[in-house]
UniProtKB/Swiss-Prot annotation:
Belongs to the bacterial ribosomal protein bL12 family. This is Large ribosomal subunit protein bL12c. Keywords: Chloroplast, Plastid, Ribonucleoprotein, Ribosomal protein, Transit peptide. Residues 1-23, 162-186 are annotated as: Disordered. HAMAP family: Ribosomal_bL12. Residues 1-11 have a biased composition (Polar residues). It comes from the Eukaryota. The keyword Ribosomal protein applies. Its main location: plastid. The gene is RPL12. InterPro entries: Ribosomal_bL12 (IPR000206), Ribosomal_bL12_C (IPR013823), Ribosomal_bL12_C/ClpS-like (IPR014719), Ribosomal_bL12_oligo (IPR008932), Ribosomal_bL12_oligo_N_sf (IPR036235). NCBIfam families: L12.
Amino acid sequence: MASTLSTITLRSPSPSTASSTHASIPFPKKALEFPIRTPKLHHRRATFLRPLAAVEAPEKVVQLGDEISNLTLADAQKLVEYLQDKLGVTAASFAPAAVAAAPGAAAEAPAVVEEKTEFDVVIDEVPSNARIATIKAVRALTSLALKEAKELIEGLPKKFKEGVSKDEAEDAKKQLEEAGAKVSIA
């Protein structure tokens, strides 16, 4: 890095006029000289880089891209279906995670829905004014002792019955709700 040297002179604060008594004696100038470096301003050149999207494409590709971007959604869907048939590919072969995330997208194979046969009765909440009635309902529906029934309704939500039939779950829900508890069937 090249720099330019220059000097600066500092003079003494003493008066520059000599007194009459020292007129014959030459008075030496008190001066100090220090080199000063002045920084040379560097101009950096910026090079312009085109974004990747601005890469030139053949005229045929540009024309095709313009036509595709002007399609309506219905026409674009038809184009996708046509290209899938012509090329023998599916969108699922390119994005297997998308198919797992959206199982409704694969309409070709209807899913077999099995009807649930076993249900769980869950006590979600018991208001403080309905605790005694709920404990009585729990004891009537199960063979639990008073202490066990009381522990069951503390620290909710808890499963009250597991793996029971739909009728039995509905009956237990009805009795517990009549006692004042909030119940759900899972």
